[in-house]
A protein has these predicted regions:
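Short beta-strand/loop segments at the ligand-binding rim of alpha/beta enzyme cores
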Residues: 40-45, 81-93, 131-140, 183-193
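Conserved, mostly hydrophobic/aromatic
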Residues: 1, 45, 61, 69, ...
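An N-cap/entry alpha-helix motif that binds or orients negatively charged groups
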Residues: 1-56
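Glycine/Thr-rich beta-alpha phosphate-binding loop at enzyme active sites
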Residues: 48-74, 150-181
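C-terminal helical cap(s) of enzyme catalytic domains, especially alpha/beta-barrels
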Residues: 176-183, 206, 219-245
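Catalytic cores of alpha/beta
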Residues: 90, 97-109, 144-158, 186-215, ...
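Glycine-rich phosphate-binding active-site loops on the catalytic face of alpha/beta enzymes
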Residues: 71, 104-124, 160-170, 208-231
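Surface-exposed amphipathic alpha-helices with a cationic face
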Residues: 33, 37, 62, 79-85, ...
């Protein structure tokens, strides 16, 4: 007998019909695309679910100008905890490869959900983007190469998360993201994943047309992550990097 998949295990505990009722009882999700594209380069800050102060950190990030919060895959309760304390949109970074996960993300209070283009055939990619939009969520389609960017756009993605190829060096990552940014049409919200350079990456990606940047936990593991996120959010709002020029 084949091992039970994580999604099958979850649906055995909470059937899809029950999950849908729970999801639709939640407040209407906030519009992620509007939050991320507002005339400046916005910042999405990732929160480590293992942190004991994760809800306090969510409040700090929001108060310091972060446009959205991202929660990695792992503890499903973390998304609900963060969503309860944050007044900005929340992105679930658990890669959604099944409709059940879209519904679960909404039931937990997420406003945006990650859909990995590389892990899905075209039909499934289109279906998941449409499912997210149909329940007022924002699908953030993860893209690591030009082929998947084209597929994401054909699937109707309004927001794309541009990430470098797995295993790329810092220099290779910057080159790959620059290439992807140059391929994105104006109508799509372009989110670029910041590398170790942080500030330098934000400036570089902004000049290449990024609407937002994702700050991973490795960039926010210092003594005062709130200050770090706030500084980068302020930098993204600088007139020199304005997206409305």
């Amino acid at each position: 007998m084949a091992p039970q998949s994580p999604v099958d295990a979850r649906s055995a505990g909470v059937p899809l019909d029950e999950l849908k009722k729970l999801a639709l009882s939640r407040p209407t999700p906030r519009c992620g695309s509007e939050a991320l594209r507002c005339g400046r380069v916005t910042v999405i800050a990732e929160i480590d679910p293992a942190r004991a102060d994760r809800t306090s950190l969510a409040e700090q990030y929001a108060s310091r100008g972060v446009a959205a919060l991202a929660v990695p895959a792992g503890d499903p309760a973390c998304v609900a905890d963060i969503a309860a304390f944050a007044d900005v949109p929340v992105l679930s970074l658990e890669p959604a490869t099944a409709s059940y996960q879209i519904w679960q993300a909404r039931a937990q209070g997420a406003d945006l959900v990650l859909v990995p283009a590389a892990a899905l055939p075209d039909v499934a990619l289109v279906a998941l983007v449409e499912r997210a939009e149909s329940i007022a969520m924002t699908a953030v389609v993860e893209v690591r190469d030009g082929r998947d960017l084209v597929r994401a756009l054909r699937a109707g993605a309004r927001v794309v998360l541009l990430r470098p190829p797995v295993g790329a060096t810092a220099a290779q990552a910057r080159t790959a993201l620059a290439d992807l940014l140059s391929m994105c049409p104006e109508g799509v919200v372009r989110v670029a994943e910041c590398g170790p350079a942080g500030q330098a990456d934000l400036i570089s990606f902004a000049r290449l047309g990024a609407d937002a940047v994702l700050l991973g936990t490795e960039l926010l593991d210092g003594a005062d992550p709130g200050a770090t996120a706030g500084r980068l959010a302020s930098m993204g709002a600088h007139p020199a990097l304005s997206r409305s020029r």
